[in-house]
């Protein structure tokens, strides 16, 4: 599990592409501290397993499913990527719950400055927007951000200068693809409330969680 607080921006050193997979080699420093082979590192919001370690970087395998559902396929040597190690049990929870399992890819539709703030508008499909709510959390390329506005085409986030400077947001331009992961809590609630047509409801498998119960509890 991750928190969406980027620890450093790494650089893609090499991409070895296979027929349906790839091996990324990434130059990094901070995320190498206490990292061992087999540990998880989020790369632009995608949970990858460290397969090799070097004094100044690491390698990770990327499978076919990940390439299809993310923007990693468009990376090249020299690309800047956001990096975060998996959260330790005694770590500070600075962002929100981030699984590192990307829901899909959005595209930056607009970037504008408002005094010191930088606004990013991202267009995304309905399968992603259904889980995006105003004032809720969303992960963009591994960055935990708060949704400021949402409509039928996409959503907007307002970022502070520190976030832009410490992530690869300062490299982003209109039209760029970005990895999106919506709040996992909303997905679980939807799953519990959705009728399961594939199997009969019995006392053993029928959920006791209802919409009315959630409303009573303040959701």
Language-model features and meaning:
Residues 1-219:
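Conserved loop->alpha-helix
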């Amino acid at each position: 599990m991750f928190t969406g607080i980027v620890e450093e921006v790494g650089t893609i050193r090499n991409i070895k592409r296979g027929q349906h997979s790839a091996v990324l080699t990434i130059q990094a420093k901070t995320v190498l501290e206490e990292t061992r082979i087999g540990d998880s590192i989020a790369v632009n919001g995608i949970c990858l397993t460290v397969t090799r370690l070097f004094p100044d970087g690491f390698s990770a395998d990327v499978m076919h499913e990940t390439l299809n559902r993310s923007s990693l396929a468009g990376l090249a040597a020299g690309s800047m990527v956001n990096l975060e190690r998996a959260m330790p049990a005694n770590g500070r929870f600075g962002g929100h719950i981030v699984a590192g399992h990307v829901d899909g890819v959005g595209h930056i539709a607009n970037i504008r400055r408002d005094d010191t703030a930088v606004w990013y508008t991202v267009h995304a499909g309905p399968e992603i927007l259904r889980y995006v709510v105003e004032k809720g959390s969303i992960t963009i390329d591994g960055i935990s951000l708060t949704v400021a506005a949402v409509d039928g085409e996409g959503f907007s986030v307002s970022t502070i200068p520190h976030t832009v400077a410490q992530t690869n947001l300062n490299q982003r331009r209109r039209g760029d693809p970005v990895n999106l992961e919506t709040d996992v809590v909303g997905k679980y609630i939807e799953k519990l409330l959705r009728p399961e047509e594939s199997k009969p409801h019995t006392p053993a498998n029928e959920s006791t969680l209802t919409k009315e119960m959630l409303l009573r509890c303040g959701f």
